């Protein structure tokens, strides 16, 4: 559910006043993640790596207070549900968007992920959810990337998590992960904590 709230009654009051009308309010932080466990689980249990990564992002976001807030059209909104948006390569060679509701049940999330993305790919039609806080993702696995800085548009102020191809070594598999967020939504320290919590979610899976 989506509810408008008074920013002056939240701890984001100062940030809302400072950044709501800023020409470039988006910030990007990058952290290199140890994803060895995700790769191992993907191979052992048959999950797609992207499914596991998206589930970990959703699980971490659902426990992050700031990621339930979103500035939009000069107002501040609070959401009680999280969904993950993925970019899907469709059957015609183009791309579409697909929103997947987060659930703590990994098996259910996997079923939803496979069902919804398959439908979007086959029908070449994007699928969106209303009333959910959407955390965007973009996986550009064609090459290794050190950092991804998303283009700012006032049509999409949602947080976004982006990555490229992961890097294997003898003992670890590493992945630089870029996290873009709106400064009204959170401060740099909050974003850094989100990335650290995401790493811990991956470790604990």
Regions found by a protein language model. Name each.
Residues 1-22, 83-89:
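Short amphipathic alpha-helices and their capping loops
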Residues 2-3, 22-24, 82, 95, ...:
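Conserved GHKL (Bergerat-fold) ATPase module
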Residues 6-8, 20-52, 66-82, 97, ...:
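Gly/Ser/Thr-rich phosphate-binding loops and adjoining beta-strand/alpha-helix segments
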Residues 30-32, 85-89, 98-101, 136-140, ...:
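Residues in well-ordered beta-strands of folded domains
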Residues 38-63, 175-194:
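Acyl activation and transfer enzymes in specialized metabolism, enriched
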Residues 90-145:
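Helical lid/core segments from catalytic subdomains that handle acyl or acyl-like groups
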Residues 121, 198-205:
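A common structural junction motif
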Residues 150-180, 184-186, 194-199:
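Intrinsically disordered, low-complexity linker/assembly segments
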């Amino acid at each position: 559910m989506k509810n408008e709230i008074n920013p002056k009654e939240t701890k984001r009051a100062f940030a809302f006043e400072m950044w709501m009308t800023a020409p470039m309010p988006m910030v990007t932080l990058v952290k290199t993640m140890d994803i060895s466990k995700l790769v191992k689980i993907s191979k052992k249990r048959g999950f797609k790596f992207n499914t596991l990564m998206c589930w970990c992002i959703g699980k971490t976001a659902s426990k992050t207070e700031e990621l339930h807030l979103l500035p939009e059209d000069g107002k501040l909104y609070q959401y009680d549900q999280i969904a993950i948006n993925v970019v899907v390569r469709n059957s015609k060679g183009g791309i579409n968007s697909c929103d997947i509701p987060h659930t703590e049940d990994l098996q259910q999330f996997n079923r939803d992920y496979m069902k919804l993305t398959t439908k979007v790919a086959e029908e070449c039609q994007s699928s969106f959810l209303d009333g959910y806080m959407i955390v965007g993702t973009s996986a550009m696995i064609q090459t290794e990337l050190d950092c991804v800085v998303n283009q700012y548009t006032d049509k999409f102020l949602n947080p976004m998590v982006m990555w490229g191809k992961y890097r294997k070594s003898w003992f670890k598999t590493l992945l630089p992960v870029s996290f873009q967020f709106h400064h009204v939504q959170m401060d740099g320290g909050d974003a850094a904590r989100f990335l650290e919590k995401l790493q811990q979610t991956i470790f604990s899976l």
